[in-house]
From Swiss-Prot:
The keyword Cytoplasm applies. InterPro entries: Ribosome_maturation_RimP (IPR003728), RimP_C (IPR028998), RimP_C_sf (IPR036847), RimP_N (IPR028989), RimP_N_sf (IPR035956). Belongs to the RimP family. Keywords: Cytoplasm, Ribosome biogenesis. Its main location: cytoplasm. It is found in: Cytoplasm. One of its GO terms (biological process) is translation. It holds the Pfam family DUF150_C. The gene is rimP. This is Ribosome maturation factor RimP. It comes from the Bacteria. NCBIfam families: PRK14639.1. Required for maturation of 30S ribosomal subunits.
Length: 140
């Protein structure tokens, strides 16, 4: 099953998916984006496309709930493409060496992310493979 193509059919772009357990229930979440933002009708349209397909070809074993939503303003960055689409945004990164970084994404290439330190404006480049986890954040 090609989630990216199915999202495109609903005029959305696939961002990510995850399987989580909350209160003993399995939830299969699909995150989507589109220019101008995702609304409830967009999520419902994709859910209507996916439900009959998932009835025949379930994405996970056993009983589960399907959720379709936008990844949100503060979202996980797990692919190099996520960083590329987040240029200009603030990010919290934990490296494989457990170093914590808060910076602004200023450039992305095939395997490196260039960041600007929020305090001293110093620029640094980090290899994507050196990142354990990353998430955008907003300063309120």
């Amino acid at each position: 099953m090609n989630l990216e193509a199915l999202c495109k059919e609903a005029e959305l772009s696939f961002y990510d998916d995850e399987l989580v357990s909350e209160n003993g229930k399995k939830i299969y979440r699909i995150y989507v984006q589109k220019e101008g933002g995702v609304n409830l009708d967009d999520c419902a349209r994709l859910s209507e496309i996916l439900s009959p397909i998932f009835d025949v070809e379930p994405p996970v074993n056993g009983e589960y709930f399907l959720e379709v939503s936008s990844p949100g303003l503060e979202r996980k960055l797990s692919k190099i493409e996520h960083f590329a689409k987040s240029i200009g945004e603030l990010v919290k990164i934990t490296t494989n060496e457990k170093e914590k970084i808060e910076a602004k994404i200023i450039a992305v290439d095939d395997e490196n992310i260039t960041l600007e330190n929020l305090e001293n404006k110093e620029k640094t480049t980090i290899n994507f493979n050196d990142i354990k986890k990353a998430r955008t954040f907003m300063e309120w």
